[in-house]
Amino acid sequence: TMGGVFIAAGTFFGFLIAHINFWTIGQGFKVEIDYIVPEVLSLLLFGTLMASVGFIDDFLKVQQGRNLGLNAKNKIILQIIVASIISYYFYTWDLSTTLYLFSGFGVDIGIAKWFIIVLFIVGFTNAVNLTDGLDGLVAGTSTVSFGGVLVMTFWIFRHQNYYTNFMNDAFLSLDLSILVSSIAGSCLGFLWWNTNPAKIIMGDVAVSYTHLRAH
């Protein structure tokens, strides 16, 4: 039930190996990448934090020998704590709190934006958990989802002159591409073993880890 550990490990090592390749060889792009973008590293850490909640849940299931891990109340509390840490991190960015309902029309929602972020992350994580009832469903949809993000982030990197207001750091979009491609590759590799009949179950570790799509 803890097959998601392989997805998390595959993502970490894929991301690390890609950066080692850039640091040592650097071929393929006319850029020199000698660091990991802090924003992308934070996403990786946040994914690990949320996955740790799923790990506790899965570990209790294995330890008790039955399909009962954390109860709903404790699980939600832990998810809210992690989501609050993530929300506070975004708060330190001094981002705009204006919510645009229509083009040219926005409403300043103030501090409510950070509560919305917490609600969105917790809600998205549990929504993904609901889709984990069929073999290969979460792994398959996650592969497609992260694959789509990969196309967008890499496109922005290759056309960075058109997105200077959106991506001030040219390496940010490329580093995001590396991260999401690592996750997509891990999900795709896991899908081989998770299709019906599943030999390995994803578990709450991977379900919680794939909440990165919410960011």
Report residues per predicted region:
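"…together with the soluble PPM/PP2C metallo-phosphatase catalytic core" -> "…together
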Residues: T1-R213
